[in-house]
Design a protein with these regions (language model features):
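A short acidic-to-branched-hydrophobic micro-motif
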Residues: 41-45, 50-60
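Hydrophobic residues embedded in beta-strands of well-ordered beta-sheets
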Residues: 31, 50-52, 95-97
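Structural motif
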Residues: 27, 46-48, 93
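Charge-rich, low-complexity N-terminal segments
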Residues: 1-41
């Protein structure tokens, strides 16, 4: 069985676990799953890497403006301790932060994929939230009142 076939069968079995009959890759080879309307995770069979790739966009990110966050992302990648085995990255063309993971489909069952996906989603949500926080020491926004001038 080819990698694409194995990944397609895994995805279909995952869909059954979620109560989604016929879950499959689209014509581009992607499957998008939305979680709590807060995070979309894409799955794809990648023959170049030999696995099923999970990826999620965490938000806009300009590394030069947030060196503190860039350092946190590098530290987060160390031994994958706080990324559930995934890797944090920055898309240089779009200035967005991503979480990416490649899973070997060999011996992977739908329940194991579900568990890995859950860990991935939790890590993605955590890092997306962290991306939205202002840098340490940044002045707090005061809303409209803070922007008003007294005349």
């Amino acid at each position: 069985m080819s990698l694409r076939e194995r990944c397609a069968r895994l995805l279909e079995a995952l869909g059954r676990r979620f109560g989604i009959e016929g879950l499959a890759f689209d014509e581009r080879g992607l499957c998008a799953l939305a979680f709590d309307r807060r995070m979309t995770v894409y799955l794809a069979a990648d023959t170049r890497l030999g696995g099923m790739v999970l990826f999620a966009t965490l938000g806009e990110f300009e590394p030069a403006e947030r060196p503190d966050l860039l350092l946190a992302m590098l530290r987060g990648n160390f031994m994958w301790r706080v990324t559930e085995g995934a890797t944090l990255a920055v898309d240089p063309e779009k200035d967005v932060a991503l979480l990416v993971q490649c899973l070997s489909p060999q011996g992977l069952e739908a329940d194991q994929l579900e568990a890995r996906l859950e860990g991935f989603v939790n890590a993605a949500l955590s890092w997306a939230e962290r991306l939205q926080r202002p840098p340490a020491g940044a002045p707090e926004r005061a809303g409209l009142a803070g922007m008003m001038l007294r005349v």
